[in-house]
């Protein structure tokens, strides 16, 4: 999932609201890649036949709140934002088949290591290799951080001049070797990750999704939403943030974020009645919404015009 240090454009991990959100997320999901954290996010059921080729280690260390893979078709090119252990990518690889392609993007080295660990073995079982994992931030799908890491190993930053050269290199690869090219993706999926992005980066996140989608492309997102805007004192809690709670969008703001990024035809495919967490003693029940309620939502949207919102 999300986390860590080098940021395109300035080379430093940023602090917002007095909280280093990226460091909190990196640490939590880095640990969760090593040892299962059972209560992180909401477990869901998947098609068991699609899990047969996937090692238990990947399945056990998957942290999501929905199943966007249900909205994928054969032959499509799919981008998974915050691909984590790679479980969704390996499920989707079987749906799109040998003619399709799946790209997982994540910022967390331990998660990427886990996802890549079984690539060859799973491909051998399927008889084709159509999955790859790339390191980057989901709010900046132009900067390939594996390339940045490689550059830094050969050209460590030891002066202001070196830093300027790093910035120049990052600008160059963003244009000549983007992590994800413009209009190259049929479908974007993401599972309980958008909420982990820092507040000031969320607008860029939605703009990047729109940029990389082909015209007529689709988005299927499972994430956490709240019925009211999360209060500042909760947003400043790194444990709640990294647990997919205090970074949640308010429900209407979540939908509006897609609209503001020029998406159309927003369909609420599923809105869970059960709550993910109880915060500060607030009770959660059925479809009742109360201050601080956090629920799971699956949203599908299109990059072409159609009616505003719809429930499936």
Regions found by a protein language model. Give the residues of each.
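N-terminal auxiliary segments of SAM/dcSAM-dependent transferases
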Residues: 2-44
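A short glycine-rich, Lys/Arg-flanked "PGG" loop and its adjoining helix->strand segment in the class I
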Residues: 203-218
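Short, glycine-/aromatic-enriched active-site segment of Class I SAM-dependent methyltransferases
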Residues: 224-245
């Amino acid at each position: 999932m999300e986390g860590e240090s080098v940021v395109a454009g300035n080379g430093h991990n940023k602090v917002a609201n007095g909280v280093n959100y990226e460091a909190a997320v990196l640490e939590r999901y880095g640990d969760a890649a090593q040892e299962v954290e059972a209560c992180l996010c909401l477990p869901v059921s998947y098609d068991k036949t699609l899990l047969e080729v996937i090692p238990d280690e990947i399945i056990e260390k998957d942290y999501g709140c929905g199943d966007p893979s249900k909205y994928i078709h054969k032959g499509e090119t799919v981008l998974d934002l915050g691909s984590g252990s790679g479980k969704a990518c390996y499920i989707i690889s079987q749906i799109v088949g040998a003619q399709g392609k799946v790209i997982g993007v994540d910022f967390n080295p331990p998660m990427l290591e886990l996802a890549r660990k079984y690539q060859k073995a799973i491909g051998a079982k399927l008889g084709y290799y159509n999955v790859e994992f790339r390191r980057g931030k989901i709010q900046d799908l132009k900067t390939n951080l594996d390339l940045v890491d490689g550059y830094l190993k050969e050209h460590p930053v030891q002066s202001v001049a070196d830093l300027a050269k790093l910035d120049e290199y990052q600008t160059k690869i963003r244009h000549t070797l983007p992590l994800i090219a413009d209009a190259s993706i049929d479908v974007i999926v993401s599972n309980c990750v958008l909420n982990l992005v820092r507040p000031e980066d969320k607008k860029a996140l939605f703009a990047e999704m729109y940029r990389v989608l082909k015209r007529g492309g689709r988005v299927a997102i499972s994430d956490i939403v709240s019925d009211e805007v999360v209060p500042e004192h909760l947003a400043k809690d790194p444990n709640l943030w990294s647990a997919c709670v205090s970074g949640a969008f308010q429900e209407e703001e979540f939908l509006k974020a897609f609209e503001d990024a020029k998406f159309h035809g927003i369909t609420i495919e599923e809105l869970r009645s059960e709550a993910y967490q109880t915060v500060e003693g607030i009770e959660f029940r059925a479809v009742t919404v109360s201050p601080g309620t956090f629920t799971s939502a699956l949203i599908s949207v299109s990059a072409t015009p159609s009616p505003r919102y719809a429930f499936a």
